[in-house]
Amino acid sequence: KKQCGVLEGLKVKSEWGRAYGSGHDREAFSQAIWRATFAQVPESRSLFKRVHGDDTSHPAFIAHAERVLGGLDIAISTLDQPATLKEELDHLQVQHEGRKIPDNYFDAFKTAILHVVAAQLGRCYDREAWDACIDHIEDGIKGHH
């Protein structure tokens, strides 16, 4: 299995910059990721009661979804800076600790990211690099790094 090395990190960082876009695009992008996640694991919505996870168009959920992608954005943009990335992943791990998020929810989120990014980028997309680097980020959030 491919590792998330410097080259993979730089590729993902560059492709993420193109896929993530800006402004209103980001809202649609984050909603697409969460809808794809909930389609795979509908029961995961219960983790988001406080932010109206039953309605991905609710302003509270949109704000939450964008905060999550903001964290992912920081993680991806520091893939080529291991010390900074570790700090960010440690911070995200603390935020997720105690929530007992099953691994299959992380898997569904990763699948959603890969799907939405691929749809956004078409052929200019290195699936193996994304696969390795999203695993690396999620392992850090789960505390397996």
From Swiss-Prot:
Disulfide bonds join 4-133. It comes from the Eukaryota. The keyword Nuclease does not apply. Heme b binds at residue 96. SUPFAM superfamilies: Globin-like. One of its GO terms (molecular function) is heme binding. It holds the Pfam family Globin. The keyword Heme applies. CDD domains: Mb-like. GO terms for cellular component: extracellular region; hemoglobin complex. Residues 3-145 form the Globin domain. Keywords: Disulfide bond, Heme, Iron, Metal-binding, Oxygen transport, Transport. The extracellular hemoglobin of the earthworm consists of 12 subunits that have a hexagonal bilayer structure with a molecular weight near 3.8 million. Each one-twelfth subunit is composed primarily of disulfide linked trimers (chains A, B, and C) and monomers (chain D). Belongs to the globin family. This is Extracellular globin-2. It comes from Lumbricus terrestris.
